[in-house]
């Protein structure tokens, strides 16, 4: 029997490229659908929009996106009254983060999402190709979860100093996934008020697609 597949889990589409390509080719040969729209941006029509653009003859040149509602919530929560460690605790308590928030803080989920989008855009990309810039030290991802919670407040002073600097500059933190041609990266960036990512609220996601057609004014997809 030929059965179509809808995959909510992003492991298949972000795994080794050869396996991803084989899944797509098998679905094509069998005349069935292999769909995974919710892998990136929950209910937002991001993957389908990229596919529609390419099928119409457009070329995806650049992708800039905030793809982690959890990290966006955390960096929107940080304030003079809410230190970094408390923002992370709130994200976990409210169910935004994984039970072990280090999974979110590592950026691996964003890496997987960026790999999927880059592949849909027509590029051969592996997870290892993504330049992943951590914003907390590597040793925080080692040891037990209890040890992580004990160490986390040690980062509050540094984050507060950086937050004050951003406030003076009129900027905000965003954990940004970027594809520029074959180059891919994920990093915590400071964006100015003129940038489309600046006003992103709560745990929203946003994607900017720069294409051969939408070159001067990128296409914007935003929401939950």
Which ranges hold each PLM region?
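Rossmann-fold NAD(P) dinucleotide-binding segment
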Residues: 1-7
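Substrate-binding/catalytic subdomain of NAD(P)-dependent oxidoreductase enzymes
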Residues: 77-78, 86-198
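Rossmann-fold NAD(P)-binding glycine/threonine-rich loop
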Residues: 10-37, 42-53
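Rossmann-like dinucleotide-binding core of oxidoreductases
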Residues: 38-44, 50-54, 58-90, 100, ...
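Short phosphate-binding/catalytic loops that engage adenosine nucleotides
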Residues: 3, 32, 171
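Catalytic, metal-anchored helix/loop core of enzyme active sites in primary metabolism
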Residues: 62-64, 72-75, 90, 175-224
């Amino acid at each position: 029997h030929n059965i179509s597949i809808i995959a909510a889990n992003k492991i298949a589409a972000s795994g080794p490229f050869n396996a991803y390509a084989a899944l797509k080719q098998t679905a094509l040969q069998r005349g069935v659908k292999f769909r995974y729209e919710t892998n990136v941006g929950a209910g937002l029509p991001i993957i389908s929009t990229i596919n529609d653009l390419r099928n119409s003859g457009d070329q995806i040149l650049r992708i800039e996106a905030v793809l982690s509602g959890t990290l966006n919530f955390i960096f929107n929560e940080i304030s003079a009254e809410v230190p970094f460690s408390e923002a992370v605790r709130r994200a976990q308590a409210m169910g935004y983060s994984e039970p072990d928030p280090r999974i979110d803080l590592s950026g691996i989920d964003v890496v997987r999402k960026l790999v999927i989008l880059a592949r849909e855009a027509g590029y051969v990309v592996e997870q290892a190709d993504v330049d992943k810039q951590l914003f907390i030290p590597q040793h925080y991802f080692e040891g037990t979860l209890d040890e992580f919670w004990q160490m986390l407040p040690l980062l509050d002073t540094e984050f507060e100093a950086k937050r004050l600097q951003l406030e003076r500059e009129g900027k905000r933190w965003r954990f940004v996934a970027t594809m520029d041609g074959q180059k891919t990266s994920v990093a915590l960036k400071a964006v100015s008020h003129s940038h489309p990512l600046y006003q992103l609220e709560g745990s929203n996601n946003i994607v900017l697609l720069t294409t051969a057609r939408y070159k001067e004014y990128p296409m914007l997809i935003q929401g939950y």
